[in-house]
From Swiss-Prot:
Its EC number is 2.4.1.80. Keywords: Developmental protein, Glycosyltransferase, Golgi apparatus, Lipid biosynthesis, Lipid metabolism, Membrane, Sphingolipid metabolism, Transferase, Transmembrane, Transmembrane helix. Pathway: Lipid metabolism; sphingolipid metabolism. A motif (D2) lies at residue 144. It comes from Xenopus laevis (African clawed frog). This is Ceramide glucosyltransferase-A. Its main location: Golgi.
Amino acid sequence: MAVLDLALQGLAIFGCVLFFVLWFMHFLSIVYTRLHLNKKISDKQPYSKLPGVSLLKPLKGVDPNLINNLETFFELDYPKFEILLCVQDLDDPAVDVCKKLLGKYPSDDAKLFIGGKKVGINPKINNLMPGYEVAKYDLIWICDSGIKVKPDTLTDMANQMTEKVGLVHGLPYVADRQGFAATLEQVYFGTSHPRSYISANVTGFKCVTGMSCLMRKEVLDQAGGLIAFAQYIAEDYFMAKAIADRGWKFSMATQVAMQNSGCYSISQFQSRMIRWAKLRINMLPATIICEPISECFVASLIIGWAAHHIFRWDIMVFFMCHCLAWFIFDYIQLRGVQGGPLNFSKLDYAVAWFIRESMTIYIFLSALWDPTISWRTGRFRLRCGGTAEEILDV
């Protein structure tokens, strides 16, 4: 009995620690968002002396927003950059979109590469290799096809690339679009994701997504170039790790990495979340424990039980109050990331928030159940440590 009492006491203390950790993350991410995001920073160097940038753009397929997203890069206000458009297949409809933009902006330093180069299992790396090999500037900007930018986005990122910084990344967010699936995505990328993403980066953990990353080419080459990361599916994590291991710091851009895909649905969002969870579990096995207990409903149950065990408070009353506080702070976080009025009502937010939180356990269990993922051009079986093998159809 004494052992059981000791174990319960330990679990209760764990619940209290969890409470303070999670609410520290809430406050930290909200404060950082308010102080840093969507703020115009002072120029660190004269406009004319900004370093040259080679933009690598991996493309596969088209969606209704692709041409508009790509065009924002041709309209960047930056003194010296090149656009390297990379398409894997000759018959990909993205080729025609690229040719149309190249014809519309003949004075821009832009090139189209078709065919890729097979150097590993990662299809994104394979696609980017021809562009990377001819990139002529010291800074490499890898930016996904679904991202749109403002004219001064690259200037903002380049100003963050100070002497000791080796990588500048943008916090992923989602543009205003119509429909509930768009609201669901916006709620996730404005609440749960930035809470973890910002807290990790501010406290020294290297958390980077590859949607929009500006990196020093020299440092990547020291790590073996893009080819060194072709064995991984989550190449962005391992590129960031290689840069950090060489003593370089990271900086977050003041502008978000604005996702603006023209194709979206609840099922696509769910599949994407499951794929990301699978990658995190295989790269960082501690995710198996940390991820579920960092979500609202599970955390509220654990903390509510701890409050009942220590203070004899009613579990369900505490659970409801804790969830309500979480819900309110998430809304504050979302408004901060948005940087302006939301495109949906508070009722839409409440419904999307509840559905997103309710999906978390299903997403996590689905990720544990099956270690294979479908991504871009194939299916892959993940291995512990982040490597993968392609599953070939027989």
